[in-house]
Amino acid sequence: MSNVDRAEIAKFEALAHRWWDRESEFKPLHDINPLRVNWIDERVGLAGKKVLDVGCGGGILSEAMALRGATVTGIDMGEAPLAVAQLHQLESGVSVEYRQITAEDMAEEMPEQYDVVTCLEMLEHVPDPSSVIRACYRMVKPGGQVFFSTINRNPKAYLFAVVGAEYILNLLPRGTHDFKKFIRPSELGAWSRDAGLQVKDVIGLTYNPLTKHYKLTSDVGVNYMIQTLREA
């Protein structure tokens, strides 16, 4: 059985044409992207690395990593976002290979092929996040690193990521997130360790509605990223 939620894909299919509009529903992704790319680049040195971006959507992260000198492949199950990603790279001149395939199927094809695997803002949109994490482990080379980001599951996250972002500040379309699918850092850490990955670092992202800016922080109460290592 495929680890795909068609309803989740449909949400992003409907908005795909707005993916690269920095004032659209995807503004939060554009706003946090430099912070995320810098954080990853500081830890792995993207230049010259072979990178897989799992759940790449319209290619915002994929292109940013390619601009840092990485050879990037982006995979997603949304046909429309991938079409947007492919069109955008024609405009930008940034080279990324895009494929419509699940992480699990890609792991069958490409085991131990990547220096770095990224899976950002994707785990909370699939039925079985642990299956994706295991696939990421299989695709990264021994000694390589895997980065995940998602949203914590607690009252604060519900208030900020659902009520605040979707209903008050209108940063995201209503219904973008399902609180039940949010993932606690302890759960993500346990799934990562069960897959064979060693957790190296955890960082939070917070949003200030007054300045409309995001920043990296030790507060992992809402949005957070983790760095993991597959030991050599």
UniProtKB/Swiss-Prot annotation:
Q: In which pathway does it act?
A: Cofactor biosynthesis; ubiquinone biosynthesis
What InterPro entries does UniProt report for this protein, alphabetically?
A: SAM-dependent_MTases_sf (IPR029063), UbiG_MeTrfase (IPR010233)
UniProt keyword Lipid biosynthesis, yes or no: no
Keywords per UniProt: Methyltransferase, S-adenosyl-L-methionine, Transferase, Ubiquinone biosynthesis
The GO biological-process annotations, alphabetized, read as: methylation
Molecular function in Gene Ontology = 2-polyprenyl-6-hydroxyphenol methylase activity; 3-demethylubiquinol 3-O-methyltransferase activity; polyprenyldihydroxybenzoate methyltransferase activity
Which positions does UniProt annotate for S-adenosyl-L-methionine binding? 36, 55, 76, 120
Please give the catalytic activity noted in the UniProt record. a 3-demethylubiquinol + S-adenosyl-L-methionine = a ubiquinol + S-adenosyl-L-homocysteine + H(+); a 3-(all-trans-polyprenyl)benzene-1,2-diol + S-adenosyl-L-methionine = a 2-methoxy-6-(all-trans-polyprenyl)phenol + S-adenosyl-L-homocysteine + H(+)
Q: Which Gene3D superfamilies match?
A: Vaccinia Virus protein VP39
Keyword S-adenosyl-L-methionine on entry: yes
EC number per UniProt? 2.1.1.222, 2.1.1.64
Family assignment from sequence similarity: Belongs to the methyltransferase superfamily. UbiG/COQ3 family.
Question: What role does it play?
Answer: O-methyltransferase that catalyzes the 2 O-methylation steps in the ubiquinone biosynthetic pathway.
Name of this protein: Ubiquinone biosynthesis O-methyltransferase
